Amino acid sequence: MSVLSKAGSGFAILAASALVLSGCAAADDEAATTEETTSAAVESLALKIGTALPVTGNLAFLGPPEEAGVLLAQADINAAAAGIDLELVLGDSGDTDNKAYETEIPRLLNEGVSAIVGAASSGVSLQFIDQVTKEAGVIQISPANTSPTFTDYDDDGLYFRTAPSDVLQGEVLGNLLAADGHATVAMIVINDAYGTGLRDNATLAFEAAGGSVVSTPSYNVGDTNFTSQINEMLAEDPDAIVVLAFDETKTIVPALIDAGFSNSGLYFTDGNLADYSADFEAGLIEGSKGTLPGPPSDTISADFKERANALWTANGGEELTSWAYSTESYDAVVLLALAALAAGSTDSAEMAAKMSEVSGYTGGGTKCATFAECAEIINGGGVADYDGFSGGIALNEAGDPTETAIGIYQFDADNRPQTYLG
């Protein structure tokens, strides 16, 4: 049976999911008991995974696509009936201002989860990584953490991510700024591991290309007034400004443009590359550019989008307008399920020992693109090499993906990001 647990009122839109997914799984189980087969029945492992994704806080716009990806992965894994019976326990990571994680992480751990998917924010993940990996001995895997801090973090081999380090995104961003002909750049930076890490790596790349970073004022989570930071940047008369922010972007960007800065000189990153059609006046950021790890949204499988949207909206969610980190969230759950299947165990340490193998880093495996295909390989005694909806993954010894891409986007007249064609 497929089970979906939910936390509090924040997950009211998903209240029907347990019934919907359980019903589908029950039908599949009933069919399986009556179907004649020549292969031996696969005894299922009961795997419980928690999520700590941003339902609230300054990254709440990432919550819907990430949760939709997780829910779709659960549906596909349970529908395969190939040895994993997956239960989800949904939670809210919040942010470092509302600190939802302080109650949610203990709740998830008390549920006996083998792994927690989240957080999206690097700064938030750093608030509970020790609690999850070192103290509880549970796997933590993020679909969106990009801070370089995690590469060398002492996590007992239990931390993984399906999004690349900002060493890569910073390089792409810095090179984009230079390629666009900018000689001087300013950055407004959220003061956490994500913001400072991306600032540092973008600066390295931009300065290596001959540019100069002239101002990098920071702000703290919870701040609402950015006048001093804006004045500091504009005083340096930069060619371009990079906004390394989350939901605060909705305040920062209009203030910059009202102060006379050109929208064509604005740059966004994964923390704020979103649909602003309902937030900004039409055309406000037309021509602005941004970077986002993962496949360009217009290259994500139509089947993936249709099924994720159908699952999300059927349970009360609004139509998805962003696919940021949806595929990485899906792939994180599939990798956990494959690792459990390969290990023959839902023990966190035993699963962690199989993550590099099932993601293709150790080599020698057979390529597969779905949980069902990979499970067939594993159940047949082989080694699976999963390439998911986000592309190749290949998690190395540090838990970092080694096969990934960074997309470049440009905002249209409706303030929606579109794949940049050059």
Placement of each model-derived feature along the sequence:
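Extracytosolic ligand-binding ectodomains
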Residues: 2-14, 25-422
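C-terminal motif of bacterial Sec signal peptides marking the signal peptidase cleavage site
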Residues: 18-23
